[in-house]
Amino acid sequence: MPLKLIDLFCGAGGFSRGFKDEGFDVVLGVDNMPQVAESFKANFLEAQVLVEDIQQLRSEDVVDPLVGDVDVVIGSPPCEPFTGANPRRRPNPLDRLYDDPQGRLVLHFIRLVGDLKPKVFVMENVPALAEGPLREALKREFARVGYPNVYFNLLRAEDYGTPSHRLRLFISNARIKPPASGRKVTVIEAIGDLPPPSSPHDIPNHELIPLSPRKQKRISKLRWGEALIRYAGAEGKIYHNYVRLHPYRLAPTVMGSSRFVHPFEDRLLTVREQARLMGFPDNHVFRGGRDLQFDQVGEAVPPPLARAIAREVKRWLFKSGFG
């Protein structure tokens, strides 16, 4: 019998995609945005989908009426309170968890894990979620709901076949250290076989993005690796956007706000090309307006990394006698 999985903060389902591809039964996704939930439903037709604020969600709303007992709970609470890319991040790390309204969503994830009592949970976020006193605070919170042994697993998506850099933290009651897959996948290997978006095709989310003549002229002058926009994140760190991608290297980290310039053409990448940089298959679709589609791509767990994690979770469950 397949292992049952619930995805909290499911987004478009990148995290769930990896588990589904590894044979898990994705029974429920929860997201508070209706159009994002539509994306999830379009990709997981047999799953239930709840459009719900997780702060209002109780385990009894989920377990008996919808899915029964669950084996695995995964989720990606918003990273904005913790990421260094947010210039308005609170200076005190504990304030990010306990006082920031979005940061407190992590605590609601922990609450639901305690109520649902899965055999394994995996929570994804930026590495800064565990910096300073936050690591010990999170250990205490998980211990309080019945999980005294918690592992802070740092993984790089590019080690598992994702064509872009991405260092992320996966907090779990299982140790997750999948072996790296080997050779890295470059930008041109990821997107080079796609037809021009202006040509006839039937590839979803692969539409040309209009640019003003002024912006078109400016990006035409960019060389590989150069950026049109620079901005300051938390503590003055500089970030770049509208980067012309180097075709023979990995792409930079894909964020919801990221827009990339094609290596050889004076245009922005389409949503589909950006999804390719995250390892999404072309049959994984994104609903809503274009900016929301980009958000869904950039906020996802890359499916190749998710599948490597799913493989480790399955191994841990069998080793622990649950499989």
What residue spans do the PLM features occupy?
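Class I SAM-dependent methyltransferase "Motif I" SAM/SAH-binding loop
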Residues: 9-10
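Short beta-strand element of Class I
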Residues: 26-27
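Conserved SAM/SAH-binding beta-strand->alpha-helix loop
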Residues: 33
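Short, conserved SAM-binding/catalytic segment
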Residues: 40-49
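Conserved SAM/SAH-binding loop
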Residues: 52-57, 155
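Class I S-adenosyl-L-methionine
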Residues: 60-70, 80-241
